[in-house]
A protein has these predicted regions:
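Conserved SAM/AdoMet-binding glycine-rich loop
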Residues: 1, 10-11, 116-184
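Proteins enriched for Cys/Gly/acidic motifs involved in redox and nucleic-acid/cofactor modification
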Residues: 1-131, 169, 184
Length: 184
């Protein structure tokens, strides 16, 4: 049994004690799943743990790229993870860690691969998409403008946005891009 993601990240001690769980994988180690499964079977069933405290260690964006998704024309591309808001009612910053933005070039490479595979629409997503770039000096608007230039992509959608990012300038710039699906 594999336990992965937010549960392990926020309830790691509880998960470690659960006899039914064989492999623990935190939110920033999902790419290591196959490696951890191999280690589990090579270790003759000994528990395998891959969890780091994502709130106290600087973490890079975990690249999980997509080349195709069944027989669809729309692809979801995660460009941001984590949150720095620490709202009193929310566990996300503890479960997902601080804001981490994906490198613009890596996003563009994935979008180009998807377009070459026949995808016509991309949805840019993130845990707190409005915070894209605050950790690396980029902006969500710049990323959207770059994705807009990719040949073969006909529609661009945005995951949920927080209202604070939707300034008059932001809305005006989006309105100039014919590939942006109407959100406002």
């Amino acid at each position: 049994v594999v336990a992965a993601g937010c549960y392990v990240q926020t309830k790691g001690d509880e998960a470690k004690c659960d006899e039914a769980i064989d492999i623990l994988i935190g939110n920033n180690q999902k790419k290591e799943l196959v490696e951890r499964l191999d280690a589990f079977f090579a270790g003759r069933g000994e528990k395998v743990e891959a969890v780091v405290d994502i709130n106290h260690e600087k973490q890079a964006f975990e690249e999980l790229t997509l080349d195709h998704a069944a027989e669809h024309t729309r692809a979801f591309i995660k460009v941001q993870d984590g949150c720095n808001q620490f709202c009193s009612y929310c566990i996300i910053p503890y479960a997902r860690g601080r804001v981490r933005s994906r490198n613009v070039q890596n996003v563009l490479e994935e979008v180009k691969r998807l377009a070459a595979s026949g995808y016509q629409e991309v949805v840019l997503t993130g845990i707190h998409l409005s915070s894209y770039g605050i950790d690396c000096g980029e902006s969500l608007l710049h990323l959207i403008q770059m994705v807009h230039q990719v040949e073969g992509i006909r529609r661009i959608r945005l995951g949920s946005l927080e209202p604070r990012i939707v300034t008059e300038t932001f809305a005006e710039e989006l309105a100039k891009m014919e590939k942006i699906c109407p959100h406002f």
